[in-house]
Amino acid sequence: VLTDDDKNHVRAIWGHVSNNPEAFGAEALYRLFTAHPASKTYFSHFDLHENSAQIRXXXXKVVDALTQAVNNLDDLSGAISKLSDLHAEK
């Protein structure tokens, strides 16, 4: 359970990320691929080269979804239920 202070810290830090979702999201995805190369199998239909438009677009969507979660820290399950349902059906 997050305290109000914890939530404020998360919001402050996330503010920097949400200002440039494509760049931060792509960087996170490339780091995932470096640390866990097997994760690339989930993106086999993507162009995985650096600065790939597909990676940047997918990563921006992830950051946007996480931004919604950060904006709704008091109701995380409600904030991300649509995204959860989408991924459960795929």
From Swiss-Prot:
InterPro entries: Globin, Globin-like_sf, Globin/Proto, Hemoglobin_a-typ, Hemoglobin_oxygen_transport, Hemoglobin_pi. Red blood cells. Pfam families: Globin (PF00042). One of its GO terms (cellular component) is haptoglobin-hemoglobin complex. It comes from the Eukaryota. Gene3D superfamilies: Globins (1.10.490.10). One of its GO terms (biological process) is hydrogen peroxide catabolic process. Keywords: Heme, Iron, Metal-binding, Oxygen transport, Transport. Residues 1-90 form the Globin domain. GO terms for molecular function: haptoglobin binding; heme binding; iron ion binding; organic acid binding; oxygen binding; oxygen carrier activity; peroxidase activity. Belongs to the globin family. Heterotetramer of two alpha chains and two beta chains. Involved in oxygen transport from the lung to the various peripheral tissues. This is Hemoglobin subunit alpha-1. It comes from Saara hardwickii (Indian spiny-tailed lizard).
